[in-house]
């Protein structure tokens, strides 16, 4: 039965024209897929013919590439004695078999393989592989980056994304020159009278005065527990490509023709998706991350971003380390808030926690209306639904709250929480870096007493000389500080690119976090925690 259906497909494939009565349809593609599924991956010439017949009917780029990738996988799994009986009019099938021969003869020599593929394309210009090579074959043509990669930096250098692209570029190029050394911690230089006096009132007065004197300065954190590693050296010139309004295939072709063997970028998610779908024949460190269902293992594609989901996972880990049992996630009422809550819950349960709860809040105006009516935020919520099985519903009162809010929102949310609870039931409060905007005055710091928040090492006291250097480059804009830190770490990752795919133990203390590599070569950032304490910002205890 399989043979008969496959040969029927072969007749459609071998026709050079399609009449009105033979117009292919979605049902034809589904019919061929049912034959493929029935074969259960068992290699055969008949199933190869079905793949070939199905290919021109697939209009979705992802499905089309999947067809080619599956055909190639099956072809590489076949024994030589299975590849026989090719008819004279089966030019497509003959082309694939010829390409297999080129691959097997040159798979250990990427340059020779590329040359062989180029020659093959001229001989089989109508083969679907001439336009869309199998992903595994493309990856076989890519050489390692090496210790001194030639880097093409893909960033928006004009248009609305220009300010973000420039901040990343500045950090990237400054890292190439080397980072300034970290100064000796100033944590031990306070007057002796304020240390160990045992007089809490005098200590607080001293700290408040010191904070007020420096109110207009950028609050620095002196931390000996957070560090930023030295960056690799590479004297190769870096070329910046403006991605604004440009098509990724043309930019990639230009970069590779000019001899660049590593692309860092692009930044915009739509561009990252385009470069992933085009199966680019070059190593790529994308500066954004695709959704989980779009990620696929590629030996030449890694993802690095300032992911707020990573911060949520950090918060879940921190609460578990501190022995918290019943967390509430307080997020904006938006798809963004839903994503953050889900990321927190998944990590919380992965670390052995029960079901986490979620509550949303509205705009700043609605928060002000609520606080004017004396309406607080009660410690209740709805369970966050994640795919984890067998997780028990946690019982008891809320003992920790993770707040994802802007600074203006946090100044309303914190007192609203305190309005609705008694002092004996006060939960620990944790916030994301979203609320830390810098230049906070003494009143704000005292108002936020006890709140812990995550922040990138560059802003958490790891290297205040580097922070001062960045301050002059980004006009003291905290959001741009973080992008500058991302640029520094992109440089470190780019110059360690070969280790990212092959070393699950890879770690680097970066300016944007402690970096490690997770599945599908996604870079994960672990952030340090700070805390508002007696009018100052200090490393969290």
Show where each model-derived region lies:
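Long amphipathic alpha-helical scaffold segments
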Residues: 68-171, 177-186, 196-237
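Beta-alpha junction/loop-to-helix N-cap segments that form part of ligand/metal-binding clefts
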Residues: 167, 186, 192-292
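C-terminal motif of bacterial Sec signal peptides marking the signal peptidase cleavage site
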Residues: 6-9
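Extracytoplasmic ligand/sensor domains, especially the bilobed periplasmic-binding protein
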Residues: 262-265, 269-343, 347-357
């Amino acid at each position: 039965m399989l043979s008969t259906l496959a040969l029927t497909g072969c007749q459609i494939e071998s026709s050079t024209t399609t009449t009105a009565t033979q117009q292919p349809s979605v049902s034809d593609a589904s019919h061929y897929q049912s034959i493929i599924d029935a074969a259960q991956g068992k290699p055969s010439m008949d199933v190869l013919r079905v793949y070939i017949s199905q290919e021109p009917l697939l209009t979705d780029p992802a499905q089309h590439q999947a067809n080619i990738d599956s055909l190639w996988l099956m072809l590489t799994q076949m024994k030589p004695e299975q590849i026989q009986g090719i008819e004279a009019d089966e030019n497509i099938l003959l082309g694939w078999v010829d390409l297999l021969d080129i691959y097997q003869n040159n798979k250990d020599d990427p340059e020779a393989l590329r040359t062989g593929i180029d020659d093959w394309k001229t001989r089989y210009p109508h083969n679907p592989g001439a336009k869309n090579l199998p992903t595994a074959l493309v990856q076989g043509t890519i050489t390692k980056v090496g210790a001194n990669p030639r880097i093409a930096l893909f960033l928006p250098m004009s248009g609305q994304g220009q300010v973000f692209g420039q901040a990343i570029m500045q950090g990237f190029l400054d890292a190439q020159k080397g980072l300034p050394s970290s100064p000796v911690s100033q944590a031990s230089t306070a007057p002796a009278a304020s240390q160990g006096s045992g007089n809490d009132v005098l200590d607080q007065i001293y700290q408040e005065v010191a904070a007020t004197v420096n109110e207009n300065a950028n609050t620095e954190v002196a931390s000996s527990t957070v560090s930023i590693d030295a960056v690799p050296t590479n004297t190769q010139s870096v070329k910046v490509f403006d991605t604004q309004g440009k098509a990724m295939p043309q930019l990639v072709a230009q970069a590779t023709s000019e001899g660049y063997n590593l692309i860092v970028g692009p930044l915009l998610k739509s561009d990252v998706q385009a470069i992933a779908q085009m199966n680019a024949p070059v190593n790529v460190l994308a500066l954004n991350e695709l959704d989980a269902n779009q990620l696929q293992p590629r030996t030449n594609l890694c993802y690095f971003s300032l992911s707020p989901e990573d911060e949520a996972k950090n918060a879940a880990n921190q609460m578990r380390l501190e022995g918290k049992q019943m967390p509430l996630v307080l997020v904006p009422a938006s798809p963004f808030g839903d994503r953050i809550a889900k990321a927190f819950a998944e990590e919380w349960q992965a670390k052995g926690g029960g079901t986490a709860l979620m509550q949303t809040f509205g705009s700043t105006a609605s928060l002000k209306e609520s606080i004017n009516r004396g309406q607080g935020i009660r410690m209740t919520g709805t369970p966050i639904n994640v795919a984890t099985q067998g997780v028990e519903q946690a019982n008891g009162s809320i003992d920790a709250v993770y707040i994802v809010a802007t600074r203006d929102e946090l100044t309303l949310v914190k007192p609203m929480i305190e309005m609705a609870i008694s002092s004996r039931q006060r939960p620990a409060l944790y916030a994301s870096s979203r609320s830390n905007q810098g230049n906070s005055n003494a009143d704000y710091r005292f108002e936020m007493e006890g709140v812990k928040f995550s922040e990138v090492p560059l802003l958490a006291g790891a290297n205040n000389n580097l922070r001062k250097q960045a301050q002059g480059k980004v006009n003291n804009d905290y959001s741009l500080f973080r992008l500058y830190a991302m640029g520094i770490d992109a440089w470190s990752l780019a110059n360690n690119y070969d280790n990212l795919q092959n070393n699950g133990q890879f770690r680097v203390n970066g300016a944007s976090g402690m970096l490690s590599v997770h599945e599908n070569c996604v870079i994960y950032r672990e952030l340090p925690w700070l805390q508002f304490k007696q009018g100052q910002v200090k490393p969290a205890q």
